[in-house]
Amino acid sequence: MYLFEYKNSLGGKSMEKNNKELKLEKKYDLAWDSYSKEDLEAVFSLNERYIEFMSECKTERECITKSIEIAEKGGYINLKDIIKNKETLKAGDKVYAELMGKVLVMFLIGEESLENGMNILGAHVDSPRIDLKQNPLYEDSDISLFKTHYYGGVKKYQWVTTPLAIHGVVVKKDGTIVNIVIGEDDKDPVVGISDLLIHLSADQMAKTLAKGIDGESLNVCVGSMPLEDKDAKQK
Protein backbone atom coordinates (compact mmCIF):
# COMPACT_ATOMS: atom_id res chain seq x y z
CA MET A 1 0.00 0.00 0.00
CA TYR A 2 1.32 3.47 -0.87
CA LEU A 3 0.25 6.88 0.37
CA PHE A 4 0.73 9.79 -2.03
CA GLU A 5 0.77 13.29 -0.57
CA TYR A 6 -0.64 16.17 -2.62
CA LYS A 7 -0.02 19.87 -1.96
CA ASN A 8 -1.42 23.06 -3.43
CA SER A 9 1.10 25.39 -5.00
CA LEU A 10 1.51 28.72 -3.27
CA GLY A 11 -0.27 30.45 -6.10
CA GLY A 12 -3.16 28.03 -6.10
CA LYS A 13 -2.79 27.53 -9.85
CA SER A 14 -1.80 23.87 -9.86
CA MET A 15 -1.72 20.69 -7.79
CA GLU A 16 1.65 18.99 -7.37
CA LYS A 17 2.25 15.42 -6.26
CA ASN A 18 4.85 15.09 -3.61
CA ASN A 19 7.57 12.76 -4.83
CA LYS A 20 7.88 11.20 -1.41
CA GLU A 21 6.09 7.86 -1.13
CA LEU A 22 5.21 6.49 2.27
CA LYS A 23 5.17 2.70 2.18
CA LEU A 24 2.81 1.22 4.74
CA GLU A 25 3.45 -2.31 5.90
CA LYS A 26 1.88 -4.55 8.52
CA LYS A 27 3.94 -7.27 10.06
CA TYR A 28 2.31 -10.57 10.94
CA ASP A 29 3.81 -12.98 13.44
CA LEU A 30 3.12 -16.70 13.34
CA ALA A 31 0.94 -17.77 16.24
CA TRP A 32 2.98 -20.97 16.49
CA ASP A 33 6.05 -18.91 17.41
CA SER A 34 4.25 -17.38 20.40
CA TYR A 35 2.85 -20.61 21.87
CA SER A 36 4.34 -22.01 25.02
CA LYS A 37 4.58 -25.75 25.64
CA GLU A 38 1.36 -25.55 27.66
CA ASP A 39 -0.36 -23.66 24.84
CA LEU A 40 0.62 -26.34 22.33
CA GLU A 41 -0.71 -29.08 24.58
CA ALA A 42 -4.01 -27.20 24.87
CA VAL A 43 -4.21 -26.75 21.09
CA PHE A 44 -3.68 -30.42 20.33
CA SER A 45 -6.04 -31.46 23.13
CA LEU A 46 -8.76 -29.30 21.56
CA ASN A 47 -7.97 -30.77 18.14
CA GLU A 48 -8.40 -34.31 19.45
CA ARG A 49 -11.80 -33.47 20.95
CA TYR A 50 -12.83 -31.77 17.71
CA ILE A 51 -11.79 -34.79 15.63
CA GLU A 52 -13.68 -37.09 18.00
CA PHE A 53 -16.81 -34.93 17.68
CA MET A 54 -16.63 -34.79 13.88
CA SER A 55 -15.99 -38.54 13.63
CA GLU A 56 -18.95 -39.41 15.84
CA CYS A 57 -21.48 -36.83 14.65
CA LYS A 58 -22.34 -37.18 10.96
CA THR A 59 -25.89 -35.75 10.99
CA GLU A 60 -27.73 -32.82 12.58
CA ARG A 61 -29.46 -35.07 15.10
CA GLU A 62 -26.20 -36.69 16.16
CA CYS A 63 -24.56 -33.28 16.57
CA ILE A 64 -27.42 -32.04 18.74
CA THR A 65 -27.42 -35.22 20.85
CA LYS A 66 -23.67 -34.95 21.43
CA SER A 67 -23.91 -31.22 22.15
CA ILE A 68 -26.54 -31.87 24.81
CA GLU A 69 -24.29 -34.51 26.37
CA ILE A 70 -21.41 -32.01 26.50
CA ALA A 71 -23.70 -29.26 27.82
CA GLU A 72 -25.01 -31.43 30.65
CA LYS A 73 -21.45 -32.25 31.68
CA GLY A 74 -20.89 -28.49 31.81
CA GLY A 75 -23.78 -27.96 34.21
CA TYR A 76 -26.64 -27.17 31.81
CA ILE A 77 -30.13 -28.41 32.78
CA ASN A 78 -33.06 -29.20 30.48
CA LEU A 79 -35.57 -26.35 30.57
CA LYS A 80 -38.40 -28.91 30.56
CA ASP A 81 -37.20 -30.22 33.92
CA ILE A 82 -37.10 -26.68 35.31
CA ILE A 83 -40.70 -26.10 34.22
CA LYS A 84 -41.86 -29.54 35.39
CA ASN A 85 -40.41 -28.99 38.85
CA LYS A 86 -41.79 -25.43 38.95
CA GLU A 87 -38.35 -24.07 39.71
CA THR A 88 -37.29 -20.44 39.33
CA LEU A 89 -34.28 -19.40 37.31
CA LYS A 90 -31.69 -17.13 38.87
CA ALA A 91 -28.53 -15.40 37.73
CA GLY A 92 -25.82 -17.89 36.86
CA ASP A 93 -28.17 -20.78 36.03
CA LYS A 94 -27.47 -22.77 32.88
CA VAL A 95 -30.40 -24.21 30.92
CA TYR A 96 -30.98 -25.65 27.47
CA ALA A 97 -33.90 -26.58 25.23
CA GLU A 98 -34.02 -28.73 22.10
CA LEU A 99 -36.55 -28.93 19.27
CA MET A 100 -37.23 -32.16 17.37
CA GLY A 101 -33.69 -33.32 18.03
CA LYS A 102 -32.30 -30.90 15.44
CA VAL A 103 -32.25 -27.52 17.19
CA LEU A 104 -30.50 -26.59 20.44
CA VAL A 105 -30.57 -23.35 22.42
CA MET A 106 -28.51 -22.79 25.56
CA PHE A 107 -28.96 -19.99 28.07
CA LEU A 108 -26.65 -18.61 30.72
CA ILE A 109 -28.98 -16.54 32.89
CA GLY A 110 -27.68 -13.03 33.53
CA GLU A 111 -28.29 -10.54 36.31
CA GLU A 112 -30.23 -7.93 34.33
CA SER A 113 -33.72 -8.14 32.82
CA LEU A 114 -34.16 -9.33 29.23
CA GLU A 115 -35.64 -5.90 28.55
CA ASN A 116 -32.08 -4.61 28.72
CA GLY A 117 -31.02 -6.98 25.95
CA MET A 118 -29.02 -10.18 25.72
CA ASN A 119 -25.87 -11.44 24.05
CA ILE A 120 -26.54 -14.00 21.31
CA LEU A 121 -24.05 -16.39 19.76
CA GLY A 122 -25.52 -18.37 16.86
CA ALA A 123 -24.28 -21.26 14.75
CA HIS A 124 -25.74 -23.86 12.42
CA VAL A 125 -24.96 -27.54 12.02
CA ASP A 126 -23.48 -28.00 8.56
CA SER A 127 -23.71 -31.66 7.60
CA PRO A 128 -22.80 -32.24 3.93
CA ARG A 129 -23.99 -35.70 3.06
CA ILE A 130 -25.82 -37.95 0.62
CA ASP A 131 -29.45 -38.65 1.55
CA LEU A 132 -31.53 -41.66 0.56
CA LYS A 133 -34.56 -40.99 -1.59
CA GLN A 134 -38.04 -41.80 -0.24
CA ASN A 135 -38.12 -45.23 -1.92
CA PRO A 136 -34.43 -45.86 -2.50
CA LEU A 137 -34.05 -49.62 -2.92
CA TYR A 138 -33.71 -51.13 -6.39
CA GLU A 139 -31.82 -53.94 -8.11
CA ASP A 140 -29.48 -53.80 -11.08
CA SER A 141 -27.22 -56.59 -12.39
CA ASP A 142 -28.11 -58.75 -9.36
CA ILE A 143 -26.87 -56.03 -7.00
CA SER A 144 -29.02 -54.17 -4.46
CA LEU A 145 -28.57 -50.40 -4.56
CA PHE A 146 -29.94 -47.25 -2.92
CA LYS A 147 -30.89 -44.21 -4.97
CA THR A 148 -29.67 -40.99 -3.39
CA HIS A 149 -29.64 -37.23 -3.68
CA TYR A 150 -26.89 -35.10 -2.19
CA TYR A 151 -27.29 -32.31 0.33
CA GLY A 152 -24.93 -29.39 0.74
CA GLY A 153 -21.88 -28.40 -1.26
CA VAL A 154 -20.40 -31.84 -1.83
CA LYS A 155 -17.65 -32.60 -4.34
CA LYS A 156 -19.21 -35.64 -5.96
CA TYR A 157 -15.95 -37.23 -7.09
CA GLN A 158 -14.88 -37.55 -3.43
CA TRP A 159 -17.74 -39.94 -2.64
CA VAL A 160 -16.92 -42.81 -5.00
CA THR A 161 -14.73 -45.87 -4.33
CA THR A 162 -14.44 -45.12 -0.63
CA PRO A 163 -16.06 -46.91 2.34
CA LEU A 164 -19.22 -45.13 3.49
CA ALA A 165 -21.42 -45.36 6.57
CA ILE A 166 -25.19 -45.16 6.89
CA HIS A 167 -26.50 -42.87 9.63
CA GLY A 168 -30.20 -42.29 10.09
CA VAL A 169 -33.39 -42.47 12.10
CA VAL A 170 -36.35 -44.77 11.47
CA VAL A 171 -39.74 -44.03 13.03
CA LYS A 172 -41.97 -47.10 13.29
CA LYS A 173 -45.75 -47.03 12.94
CA ASP A 174 -46.12 -47.17 16.72
CA GLY A 175 -43.92 -44.08 17.11
CA THR A 176 -40.84 -45.96 18.25
CA ILE A 177 -37.61 -44.28 17.10
CA VAL A 178 -34.71 -46.45 15.97
CA ASN A 179 -31.29 -44.88 15.45
CA ILE A 180 -29.24 -46.61 12.76
CA VAL A 181 -25.47 -46.51 12.32
CA ILE A 182 -23.90 -49.00 9.91
CA GLY A 183 -20.31 -48.84 8.74
CA GLU A 184 -18.48 -47.12 11.59
CA ASP A 185 -17.41 -50.33 13.32
CA ASP A 186 -14.72 -52.40 11.62
CA LYS A 187 -17.00 -55.45 11.86
CA ASP A 188 -19.93 -53.72 10.13
CA PRO A 189 -20.91 -54.39 6.51
CA VAL A 190 -19.27 -52.03 4.03
CA VAL A 191 -21.33 -49.90 1.66
CA GLY A 192 -20.03 -47.65 -1.08
CA ILE A 193 -20.46 -46.05 -4.50
CA SER A 194 -18.66 -47.70 -7.39
CA ASP A 195 -16.81 -46.01 -10.26
CA LEU A 196 -15.62 -47.03 -13.71
CA LEU A 197 -12.38 -48.96 -14.08
CA ILE A 198 -9.54 -46.92 -15.52
CA HIS A 199 -9.55 -48.78 -18.89
CA LEU A 200 -13.30 -48.14 -19.31
CA SER A 201 -13.33 -44.48 -18.36
CA ALA A 202 -11.74 -42.67 -21.30
CA ASP A 203 -14.83 -40.52 -21.91
CA GLN A 204 -15.21 -39.82 -18.20
CA MET A 205 -11.57 -38.77 -17.85
CA ALA A 206 -12.02 -36.24 -20.67
CA LYS A 207 -14.71 -34.40 -18.70
CA THR A 208 -14.10 -31.59 -16.24
CA LEU A 209 -13.75 -32.44 -12.57
CA ALA A 210 -17.23 -31.05 -11.87
CA LYS A 211 -18.87 -33.31 -14.48
CA GLY A 212 -16.83 -36.49 -14.20
CA ILE A 213 -19.25 -37.87 -11.60
CA ASP A 214 -22.87 -36.73 -11.87
CA GLY A 215 -25.47 -36.79 -9.12
CA GLU A 216 -27.52 -39.55 -10.77
CA SER A 217 -24.53 -41.88 -10.51
CA LEU A 218 -24.22 -41.62 -6.72
CA ASN A 219 -26.08 -44.87 -6.07
CA VAL A 220 -24.93 -46.85 -3.05
CA CYS A 221 -24.20 -50.56 -3.31
CA VAL A 222 -25.79 -52.19 -0.25
CA GLY A 223 -25.98 -55.88 -1.13
CA SER A 224 -24.41 -58.42 -3.46
CA MET A 225 -24.89 -61.78 -1.70
CA PRO A 226 -27.85 -63.91 -2.88
CA LEU A 227 -30.36 -65.57 -0.58
CA GLU A 228 -29.35 -68.91 0.89
CA ASP A 229 -32.42 -70.58 -0.66
CA LYS A 230 -31.03 -72.05 -3.88
CA ASP A 231 -34.54 -72.73 -5.24
CA ALA A 232 -35.78 -69.16 -4.81
CA LYS A 233 -36.65 -67.45 -8.10
CA GLN A 234 -35.79 -64.04 -6.72
CA LYS A 235 -32.49 -64.19 -4.84
Task: Give residue spans per PLM region.
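N-terminal hydrophobic/helix-forming segments and targeting peptides
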Residues: 2, 7-235
